[in-house]
């Protein structure tokens, strides 16, 4: 999967990110901006916002997408999730929230295995 494909999939699953995505990527490569950059700089802060504001529908859609990326056979998608979403999420917010109630099985398993 390319960054463009992954970004399109993200925006399809989470249309609430479109404005932030467009603002952030307007001075970069647009839809082809690297997914590592997108997930770490847009999706991580967005996920904390939706958790804090208890937007359960959006939380569910986001973590369903993350789970699909983890269980996919696509190495790039798996790498983006681990390195640019789960690792920063755990490093910055791992002790603040009960992610076991939010994340799906494989996502939480990978998240729990990360050490900081």
Where are these regions (language model features)?
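N-terminal leader/targeting peptides and immediately adjacent processing regions
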Residues: 1-16
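Amphipathic alpha-helical binding modules
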Residues: 75-116
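Alpha-solenoid HEAT/Armadillo-like helical repeat scaffolds in large eukaryotic proteins
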Residues: 5, 9, 27, 68-69
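HEAT-repeat alpha-solenoid elements in large eukaryotic scaffold proteins
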Residues: 35-46
């Amino acid at each position: 999967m390319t960054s463009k494909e992954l970004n399109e999939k993200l925006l399809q699953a989470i249309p609430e990110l479109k404005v932030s995505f467009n603002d952030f990527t307007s001075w970069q490569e647009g839809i082809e901006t690297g997914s590592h950059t997108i997930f770490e700089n847009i999706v991580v802060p967005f996920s904390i916002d939706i958790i804090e504001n208890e937007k359960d529908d959006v939380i569910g859609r986001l973590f369903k997408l993350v789970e699909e990326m983890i269980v996919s056979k696509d190495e790039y998608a798996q790498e983006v999730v681990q390195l640019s979403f789960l690792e920063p999420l755990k490093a910055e917010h791992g002790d603040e929230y009960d992610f076991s109630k939010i994340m799906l099985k494989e996502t939480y398993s990978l998240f729990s295995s990360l050490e900081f």
